[in-house]
A protein has these predicted regions:
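Long amphipathic alpha-helical segments
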Residues: 1-84, 88, 94, 98
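Short glycine-rich or small-residue beta-strand-to-loop segments that form or flank ligand, phosphate
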Residues: 53-54, 78, 119-125, 174-176, ...
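Short glycine/serine/threonine-rich phosphate/pyrophosphate-binding segments
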Residues: 62-64, 129-134, 158-159, 178-187, ...
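Glycine-rich oxoanion-binding loops at beta->alpha junctions
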Residues: 104-108, 146-167, 212-213, 229
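Glycine-rich phosphate/diphosphate-binding loop of Rossmann-like nucleotide-binding domains
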Residues: 117-159
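Glycine-rich phosphate-binding loop
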Residues: 163-201
């Protein structure tokens, strides 16, 4: 239940479009709805500004569809991460308006286009990092941010990064997705005066240990202003960057 939904409910009660009894039935599901296999947090948007997001991995198609359908009843935007085509097909049967972002593996449905303010830059070291970057970029857009995508600017050809610095510096936060040794986050952090959210990716050869090498490199960065999220966690990076960007306009 987001603030817009709650205000509309109050207005409907005041205008006698809904009875007090019906309103009580709606409000009794606050702060959460028990679905037995999940307890849906109806207060998430009121507390944090964003509704609950469905992590689809490990859930059945039916569970995902049930959860997203329930969230849709009380929120203007609903999204699910780490979703498959099969997950999307199940959701679309309930919510025909739903979209699927294949590379980002995100399902999203919205009643209206977000009023986007400010911008977030999303950059990658290589093309192989793009799926993680797209999870970040699409999430940031759904959450109401303009996004600049700057891909394949890793340290093996550092001049490519320098060529895009003006665009990166216009953003209020930058998300850096890099695998292998993860050096791009440190380099970027030493060149900009905005927060850097580093995302280690699982891309690389054997000794990269599926992103562990990049994670440790980013955690040990000597550049200031860098925060690090979990391996391949584009969603977490976008959520943090969105809070930073949103704070500029509230």
């Amino acid at each position: 239940m987001d603030r817009e939904y709650l205000l509309k409910l109050c207005e409907d009660i005041r205008a006698d479009r809904i009875s007090c009894e019906d309103a009580a039935d709606i409000l009794k599901e606050l702060p959460f709805k028990d679905m037995e296999f999940a307890r849906i947090d109806n207060h998430r948007s009121l507390r944090t500004g964003y509704p609950e997001v469905v992590f689809c991995q490990g859930k059945t198609d039916s569970q995902i569809a049930d959860i997203m359908e329930l969230l849709w009843q009380k929120n203007s935007t609903v999204m699910g991460t780490r979703a498959t085509e099969a997950n999307y097909s199940a959701v679309r049967e309930r919510l025909p308006e739903a979209e699927y972002f294949e590379q980002a593996r995100i399902i999203a449905v919205s009643r209206k286009e977000a009023d986007k303010k400010g911008s977030i830059a999303v950059i990658t070291a290589g093309t192989s990092d793009i799926p993680v970057a797209e999870e970040a970029a699409v999430t940031a857009e759904i959450l109401g941010n303009n996004v600049s995508r700057i891909y394949d600017v890793g340290v093996a050809g550092i001049h490519r990064l320098f060529d895009s610095l003006d665009e990166i510096r216009k953003a209020n936060a930058v998300i850096v997705c890099a695998g292998m040794e993860g050096a791009l986050a440190s380099v970027t952090g030493g060149l900009v005066d905005i927060p850097v959210i580093a995302v280690p990716t699982s891309i690389g050869y054997g000794a990269s240990f599926n992103g562990l090498a990049a994670l440790l490199s980013m955690l040990n960065s000597c550049a200031n202003g860098i925060s690090v999220v979990n391996i391949d966690n584009g969603f977490g990076a976008a959520y943090t960057a969105s809070m930073i960007n949103r704070g500029k306009y509230e």
